[in-house]
Amino acid sequence: MIDISKLLDEIKASPYREIVISTPHTGVVTFADLKVGDTVVGPQGQWKEKPGTRLATLERERNPKPILAPEKGEICLIHSDLEGRFVEAGTPLMILRHMLTRAEVEHAILKKALHLFRAPERAKYYFIPKVEKKIRASDAHSVQVRDGMELLIMSRMKREVPLNYTGPDGVIYAIYFTINENMDAGAPLLGVCPQDQLPAIQDVIMRVQTEWTERG
């Protein structure tokens, strides 16, 4: 079993992730009026309809395209020597330091601590009706799973096939797929927690909720 408390302490020691902002295609770079230490924001609004801070503009064939911040963060590096230069696709322009939110810390811990049942291929996924009914009546934690149990329906190109769960016995702790949205092959669909590990995981999630301070 993973040492969940140790994992939380490691995250506390480096409570951020660095995001490299790279060019999506070739073009001439013009940086926005920003400097190292400035704070930028990502998309906002209920539907993320408000774009993030403009970091730079990439112009190709007289067609300028803004490069926007994907997350809230602090600029910690700008490759200002690229100003006005033609660059290839994938060229790093700057680095943002994004301070982790409470929800992101919980998500990171669960991804490490739970058994992740992954999508075998790109498709849409649904619970079988019996399981869906149980989740609606209570919650996902009420569903006990065992190896070989028929659990999901995989829908691809108008073809639906049952998908059996493979992994340790336990309860469904996290659901990562969204109905009517395609999940890529290898993407986690469910996070399953063995029954004997449930108290430890619940304890550390409670610690995150009470101890974690939002920053930035």
Residue spans for each PLM region:
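A general sequence property marking short-to-moderate contiguous segments
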Residues: M1-I11, H79
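Short beta-strand-turn/beta-hairpin segments enriched in glycine/proline and small hydrophobics
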Residues: L8-D38, T57-E74, R102-I135, I153-V171
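Short hydrophobic beta/alpha edge segments that flank linear recognition/processing sites
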Residues: Q44-L68, V87-E104, A140-N164, D184-L198
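C-terminal domain-closing interface element
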Residues: Q197-I205
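Helix-rich terminal scaffold detector
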Residues: P199, T210-G216
